[in-house]
Each structure stands twice: as C-alpha cells, then as structure tokens.
C-alpha cells in the first residue's frame, strides 16, 4: 500500500485531532531521521502509522493481538493506552502491507520504549513525545535536546514519563524503567 492510500485510510479511521497528531509525528520523525542518519522514508511511514490502532476499543485491539497470535504481558493486554502499539504493529503488516520489521517494531514500542532500542524506534518514540501538538512540562526542553543529542533527549523523556507515572501512582512497565536505566 502506498503512503497516499495509507493517509486516506487513516483520515477515515482516525479523529481529526489524531490525524493531525500523526502528521506532526511523521514530520518530526523525518527531521530527526535526517539529523541522526536514519532512513527518512521509514521514519515518515512509521510516524504516520504509529497511532493507527489508537482509537480502537480495547476489545478490538485484543482481538487483533489474539488473532495474530502475539503474546503480550497482562498489563499491556488490559491497557488500551499501551496495547495500541502492539496492535498497530500488527495492522502495519496486515492492513497496510508494511513488511519492514524496523517500522513494525518502532510502532510496537512507541509508547513504552525498551532497552537497546534501534535508531528508528528511538526516533518514533521521541517524535511522538515532542510532536507539535504536545504541551506539557519539559516538552520544550526535550525538543531542544532532540536537536543536539538523541539519547539525551530520550533519557529526559523516559525520566519525565516515569516521574509522571510515579506522581499519579500509576504502574510503570519494567522495560520502560530498564530503558531509562540503560
């Protein structure tokens, strides 16, 4: 499936706000890819599709994951905000015919991160975090760091997320904190 067809499908499937966000993530991802030597085409495509499953119901996401035979931990399985990454990685392959494992992996881990992320995973995680429509404490600091040092920006984003989760008394996935400790 070509990018124009994917965008048309996303425009139908996603809310206007989510579609605009995906466009912003794609633009941010391309800029980061050019700055840090990643493939801009991969970054563009991964940026566009990273939230392709975001607005599905938890039950629909679970069905996609189950039908595909993917195993995820219990916390992901029961968390709509996080399960859209794995479900989206499946849709990338099954709906959008994207067979590139780096793109699929970048979509899978864009909400949680993981230790030893490859360059495209880092770029999509960070592009989603610093997208133009994001407005939260430290986002401008992270945007500036992203222009200078990808790993430093990533670490600041991880720490910001972990601190927010702790303040809200919410569960933090072990591989998110492991990635930050790396």
Question: Where does each model-flagged region fall?
Answer:
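Flexible, glycine/charged-enriched surface loops at secondary-structure junctions
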Residues: 171-173
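Non-catalytic interface/linker regions that flank or bridge core catalytic/transmembrane domains
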Residues: 1-2, 166, 177
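Divalent metal-dependent catalytic cores for phosphoryl transfer on phosphate-bearing substrates
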Residues: 8-12, 32-156
